[in-house]
Regions:
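Accessory carbohydrate-binding/adhesion or oligomerization-edge regions at the termini
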Residues: 1-37, 114-120, 134, 140
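Beta-propeller folds
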Residues: 2, 7, 61, 169-170
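Short Pro/Gly-enriched beta-strand edge/turn motifs at strand-loop
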Residues: 39-42, 86
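Short, P/G- and charge-enriched loop/turn segments at secondary-structure junctions
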Residues: 41-48, 156-157
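Accessory beta-strand-rich segments of carbohydrate-active enzymes
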Residues: 46-150
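Short, solvent-exposed aromatic-acidic interface loops
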Residues: 78, 155-158
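Contiguous beta-strand segments within globular domains
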Residues: 157-172
Length: 173
């Protein structure tokens, strides 16, 4: 059953516990330690309840959308986040450690909109405590439809000496 509570993002649902060694219990023999028999080992993830599913929802008011593009930028969402806007699947990200973004413009309408994110941490998917939930900031970025894409902009040094440098700049509009 779901238990809804009001939280602020960033948020990690596992931090509040309850702590229990079952969350990271292994029965193994550590060969490097010379162990011949398997025994219980725990503690690699701090006994935090990071395995499971979590859901986040919020509302977003949008004014005149003409000429605008709306992007959600996630700095960290553990794990396997699926993003919904007004009940429509807007996107999925298969990894929890790297940032990602989604263009949600096609799913929005002027007025009140509902954003939802579901996350799922699988058993045995981490060797350490990975986090659980929207553990880093989430940003709504509004830009003109015609604009420089900050995630597709690259600057590199082609040549440099003590007197001058030549730089190359690549971007997408």
């Amino acid at each position: 059953s779901l238990h809804w509570q009001t939280v602020s993002v960033p948020h990690d649902w596992a931090i509040s516990g309850p702590f229990d060694k079952k969350w990271d219990l292994q029965v193994v023999a550590i060969v490097q330690n010379g162990e011949k028999e398997k025994s219980e080992k725990s503690g690699r993830s701090g006994a935090l309840p990071w395995i499971g599913e979590g859901y986040y929802t919020t509302s977003l008011n949008v004014g005149d959308m003409s000429g605008q593009r709306y992007t959600l930028e996630f700095d960290g969402a553990m794990a396997e986040p699926t993003v919904y806007v007004n009940g429509h699947k807007a996107g999925f990200w298969a990894y929890g450690y790297s940032p990602f973004r989604l263009d949600i413009t096609p799913f929005l309408h002027p007025g009140s909109n509902t954003l939802a994110v579901s996350l799922r941490n699988q058993p045995e998917s981490s060797r350490w405590y990975p986090g659980a939930g929207l553990y880093r900031p989430v940003k709504l970025v509004t830009m003109p439809v015609v604009s420089i894409d900050p995630w597709a902009t690259f600057l590199r040094t082609e040549k440099a000496d003590s007197a001058s440098a030549t730089l190359a700049f690549d971007t997408q509009v």
